């Protein structure tokens, strides 16, 4: 084999580098600023220029040394070349040179070492990083596979939740996207945007990562066993992560002087909207399931099966049926909905507590408006006047939004009127509305409300089994709302 090619020399296909020889091209060798030889094509492509016709993994390279004996005869002796010391992908390959004749057979690589790869697969998978020596640099730019493919290695995390770590719902960046959380990996038929699912499910279930929010499909089999439970468990996990984030945040510390302009109120409202849409979607799935079961039961003989009566309740209001299809709204789903609602109450309580902490740190003096803000110009109108204390107005708006979102959740879950916390707080602030004590008991409600379906009955049963925890969460939230509103009245001079 020829010696190292001189600068600006055109090599034959046999003596060209591995990359050019695989494409049946002739190398045009140039001299780099570092003094090494490099092919023009490899230099432009920013890939290692490797000269060597044989793969070390398939055939051992041997060298031939010629010695002259005393009798004048030349003896040829074949010696195996030194083994190639291949380091990991973070370091350049190094060779232990066995003889000077071996180094003369192959041109030196870009990095100054021998350019013989261990095998062709290592060259294609980026074992040897590209060094910027041909452009005057010395630090590695990137690996060859990244240069060829034009991108980094794919993310191997199944969830990509950056909520979850960027994959957990604790990340605030998630809430800057669309509010719906289902991906577009299902069929092409689209659904209503008002129905969303939590983001923590894997793509194996046909659900995309949480970072990519999109409307989910209404034909998702929520009535199948286990689907609704997995969705609610995922959402419950996101609720607890958000609760932990708010509890450990800087706003929880009384000595902190941090303002509330960057408070993540949108994440809490997003959770309320998600739970509302989940309740609506599950009720629709339940009604569709009841309609299909009722239609099939009418076609069957009365001696083989009993007709399904959704208004008939036995053993505490739980409807019974002899059909083989299990109801979508079973006891576990109802209790998980109840658990999500209670956790959402705790999240809202923490938010209101942070508002209270901030208001405690504010001065008690009544704010006074400057003359410039009172009389901006002679043609000013009432709508042109700026609020005296904008942070207090923002807090009041946030409290109203939280109560409205909780009221929507309670309506979507069809909760009994006695345990609707947000509705009770709203009614107490409105003298003309009905108070919680005037609401009819759940068992005495009209037939349309009492016998909607077994889902409402099961939720009510879940409330009865966990009444103590519900009362604590509801009373704490009510106290926080009243405390924040009272402090706002004092600070704003109302």
UniProtKB/Swiss-Prot annotation:
Keyword Transcription: yes
InterPro entries: Zn2-C6_fun-type_DNA-bd_sf, Zn2Cys6_DnaBD
Top-rank taxon, per record: Eukaryota
Transmembrane segments: none
UniProt-annotated stretches for the region Disordered: 57-79, 287-323, 429-449
Gene3D superfamilies reported for this sequence: Zn(2)-C6 fungal-type DNA-binding domain (4.10.240.10)
Entry's Gene Ontology cellular component terms: nucleus
Compositionally biased intervals (Low complexity): 60-69
DNA-binding region: 17-49
Alphabetical UniProt keywords: DNA-binding, Metal-binding, Nucleus, Transcription, Transcription regulation, Zinc
Residue ranges with Polar residues bias: 306-323
Entry-linked CDD domains: GAL4 (cd00067)
Annotated localization: Nucleus
SUPFAM superfamilies xref list: Zn2/Cys6 DNA-binding domain
Main location: nucleus
MF-aspect GO terms: DNA binding; DNA-binding transcription factor activity, RNA polymerase II-specific; zinc ion binding
Function: Transcription factor that regulates the expression of the gene cluster that mediates the biosynthesis of pyrrolocin.
Protein name in the entry: Pyrrolocin cluster transcription factor fsdR
Lineage, broadest ranks: Eukaryota, Fungi
């Amino acid at each position: 084999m020829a010696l190292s090619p001189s600068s600006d020399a055109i090599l034959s296909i046999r003596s060209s580098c591995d990359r050019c020889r695989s494409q049946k091209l002739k190398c045009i060798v140039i001299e780099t600023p570092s003094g090494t030889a490099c092919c023009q094509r490899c230099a432009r492509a920013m890939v290692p220029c490797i000269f060597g016709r044989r793969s070390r993994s398939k055939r051992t390279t041997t060298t031939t040394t010629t010695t002259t004996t005393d009798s004048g005869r030349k003896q040829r002796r074949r010696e195996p070349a030194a083994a190639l010391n291949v380091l990991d992908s973070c370091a350049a390959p190094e060779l232990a040179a066995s003889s000077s004749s071996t180094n003369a057979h192959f041109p030196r690589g870009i990095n100054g070492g021998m350019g013989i790869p261990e095998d062709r697969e290592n060259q294609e998978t980026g074992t040897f990083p590209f060094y910027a020596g041909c452009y005057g640099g010395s630090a590695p730019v990137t690996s060859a596979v990244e240069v060829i493919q034009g991108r980094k290695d794919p993310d191997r995390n199944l969830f990509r939740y950056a909520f979850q770590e960027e994959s957990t719902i604790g990340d605030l960046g998630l809430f800057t996207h669309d509010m719906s959380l289902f991906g577009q990996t299902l069929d092409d038929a689209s659904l209503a945007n008002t129905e969303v699912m939590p983001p923590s499910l894997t793509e194996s279930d046909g659900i995309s990562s949480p970072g990519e929010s999109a409307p989910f499909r209404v034909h998702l089999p929520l009535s199948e066993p286990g689907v609704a439970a997995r969705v609610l468990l995922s959402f419950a996990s996101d609720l607890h992560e958000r609760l932990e984030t708010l509890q450990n945040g800087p706003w929880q510390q009384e000595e902190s002087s941090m303002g509330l302009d960057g408070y993540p109120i949108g994440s809490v409202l997003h959770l309320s909207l998600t739970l509302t849409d989940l309740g609506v979607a599950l009720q629709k799935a339940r009604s569709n399931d009841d309609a299909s079961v009722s239609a099939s039961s009418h076609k069957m003989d009365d001696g083989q099966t009993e007709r399904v009566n959704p208004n008939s309740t036995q053993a505490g209001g739980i409807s019974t049926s002899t059909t083989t299809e299990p109801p979508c709204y079973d006891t576990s789903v109802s209790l998980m909905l109840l658990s999500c609602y209670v956790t959402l109450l705790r999240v809202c309580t923490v938010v209101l507590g942070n508002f209270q902490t901030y208001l405690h740190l504010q001065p008690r003096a009544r704010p006074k408006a400057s003359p410039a803000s009172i009389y901006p110009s002679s043609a000013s109108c009432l709508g042109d006047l700026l609020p005296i204390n904008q942070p207090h107005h923002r807090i009041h708006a946030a409290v109203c939004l939280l109560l409205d979102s909780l009221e929507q959740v309670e309506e979507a879950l069809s909760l009994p009127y006695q345990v609707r916390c947000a509705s009770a707080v709203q009614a107490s602030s409105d003298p003309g509305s009905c108070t919680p004590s005037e609401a009819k008991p759940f068992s005495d409600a009209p037939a349309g409300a009492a016998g909607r379906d077994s889902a409402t009955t099961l939720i009510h049963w879940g409330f009865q089994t966990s009444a103590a925890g519900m009362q604590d969460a509801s009373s704490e939230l009510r106290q926080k709302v009243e405390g924040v509103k009272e402090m706002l009245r004092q600070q704003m001079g109302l």
